[in-house]
């Protein structure tokens, strides 16, 4: 209404002589008061024919705000990744094999630039904070519900017993919860899901189907049980041949992914002797099956602890691979091992020999014996030598529990 009154008034004023010669001062005051509300209206300009009589201050400057831009960009990328996963699932239902779509170098570099080591150390310290007694049940119950943890298998089922998250993650199981299979040569060292298994060919190991990593990059230069390095491998095949110590044997591998809800300890998969430990400081990227399918040589990028030695058929190794929030890898008999430490730089490795003048063999391990633990879910990689008639009794993607058979002769 105020706008229409203003236009009428302006129309009357158009082409009229100056106000002081035709209007009484009282009329001027009344007209001014009637136009006063127009100053508060959200319009940019009023025009009388071609003349502009009022212009509001323009506020069109665009302010760049990093956080909204990052949220929009990250959300769009996450949405795209979810669409790709949905598309892959639909194609798998149709029985179509989908070639893996690998991350580019810039994507891997961008991911590695995230301070996952620092974040994992912070997470580790947070896990050590003692929870109030009244808060333990709701916090642990939420975790149990989210990741499907079976507390009936725990040695201590009372949630109030666990003072902090770290103790809860590393909970022990009842002895009868995981019977160890005595009929097979190699058992699963942990709970988890089988990502891949089979024979090592051309010095390339499959982390998932169609995505490989270099055997030499993963294990590092060969070290023998006497802690003396072999000469550098002249070719990929010669490095593989260094690991195979007996004629007629082949090299095999098995990759087991531990989800956050799985039992976090790992055990000896067979009777063997550990003679050497190699620690690779590295990134702590996620190792879930989706990432393993997306990033080539993921396990070579991440921090890991390689235990090597011998079993009755020759070379045997177990590697614990770290992941996001899983910088802490503990080996029970190795007190000198400290993972995800700021003093360790990426791109190097640290060796330690368990063979000494007083112990010429190393550390003997029995099948099923406690070997180590993660602070959260991660990955175990077995690489070992065995006769050609060794058979895995597995399916890719199957769930497996510690103590169940992996394979036998």
Curated annotation (Swiss-Prot):
Cofactor list: pyruvate
Active site: 191, 267, 378
Superkingdom of the organism of origin: Eukaryota
Keyword Repeat in annotation: no
Effect of residue 300 to Y: In LIBF; loss of autocatalytic processing; probably decreased phosphatidylserine decarboxylase activity; changed mitochondrion organization; patient-derived fibroblasts show fragmented mitochondrial morphology around the nucleus; decreased cell viability with increased CASP3 and CASP7 activation
Record's catalysed reaction(s): a 1,2-diacyl-sn-glycero-3-phospho-L-serine + H(+) = a 1,2-diacyl-sn-glycero-3-phosphoethanolamine + CO2
InterPro entries in the record: PS_Dcarbxylase (IPR003817), PSD-B (IPR033177), PSD_type1_euk (IPR033661)
Residue ranges, Mitochondrial intermembrane side: 83-409
Alphabetized GO MF terms: phosphatidylserine decarboxylase activity
Entry's EC annotation: 4.1.1.65
Gene Ontology cellular component annotations, sorted alphabetically: cytosol; Golgi apparatus; lipid droplet; mitochondrial inner membrane; mitochondrion; nucleus
Post-translational modification Pyruvic acid (Ser), affected residues: 378
UniProt GO BP: lipid droplet formation; mitochondrial protein catabolic process; phosphatidylethanolamine biosynthetic process; protein autoprocessing; regulation of mitochondrion organization
Subunit-level organization: Heterodimer of a large membrane-associated beta subunit and a small pyruvoyl-containing alpha subunit.
This protein's name: Phosphatidylserine decarboxylase proenzyme, mitochondrial
Name of the gene encoding the protein in the UniProt record: PISD
């Amino acid at each position: 209404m105020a706008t229409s009154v203003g236009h009428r008034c302006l129309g009357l004023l158009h082409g009229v002589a100056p106000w002081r010669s035709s209007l009484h001062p009282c009329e001027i005051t009344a007209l001014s008061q009637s136009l006063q509300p127009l100053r508060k209206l959200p319009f940019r300009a009023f025009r009388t024919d071609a003349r502009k009589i009022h212009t509001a201050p323009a506020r069109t400057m665009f302010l760049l705000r990093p956080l909204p831009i990052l949220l929009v960009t990250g959300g769009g990328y996450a949405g795209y990744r979810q669409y790709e996963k949905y598309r892959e699932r639909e194609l798998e239902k149709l029985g179509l094999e989908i070639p893996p779509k690998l991350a580019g170098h810039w994507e891997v570099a961008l991911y590695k630039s995230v301070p996952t080591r620092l974040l994992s150390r912070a997470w580790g310290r947070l896990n050590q904070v003692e929870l109030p007694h009244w808060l333990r049940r709701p916090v642990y119950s939420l975790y149990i519900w989210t990741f499907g943890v079976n507390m009936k298998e725990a040695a201590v089922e009372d949630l109030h017993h666990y003072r902090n998250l770290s103790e809860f993650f590393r909970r022990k199981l009842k002895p009868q919860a995981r019977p160890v299979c005595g009929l097979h040569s190699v058992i699963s060292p942990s709970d988890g899901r089988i990502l891949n298994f089979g024979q090592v060919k051309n010095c390339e190991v499959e982390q998932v189907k169609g995505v490989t990593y270099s055997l030499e990059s993963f294990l590092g230069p060969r070290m023998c049980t006497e802690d003396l390095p072999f000469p550098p491998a002249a070719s990929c095949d010669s490095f593989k041949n260094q690991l195979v110590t007996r004629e007629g044997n082949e090299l095999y591998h098995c990759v087991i992914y531990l989800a956050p809800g799985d039992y976090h300890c790992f055990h000896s998969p067979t009777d063997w002797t550990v003679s050497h430990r190699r620690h690779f400081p590295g990134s702590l990227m996620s190792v879930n099956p989706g990432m393993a399918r997306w990033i080539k040589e993921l396990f070579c990028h991440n921090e890991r602890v390689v235990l090597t030695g011998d079993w009755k058929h020759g070379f045997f190794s177990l590697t614990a691979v770290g992941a996001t929030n899983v910088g802490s890898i503990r080996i029970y008999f190795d007190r000198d091992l400290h993972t995800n430490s700021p003093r360790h730089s990426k791109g190097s490795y640290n060796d330690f020999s368990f063979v000494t003048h007083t112990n010429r063999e190393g550390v003997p391990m029995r099948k099923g014996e406690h070997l180590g633990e993660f602070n959260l879910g991660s990955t175990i990689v077995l690489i070992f030598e065995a006769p050609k008639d060794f058979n895995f009794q597995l399916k890719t993607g199957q769930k497996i529990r510690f103590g169940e058979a992996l394979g036998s002769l």
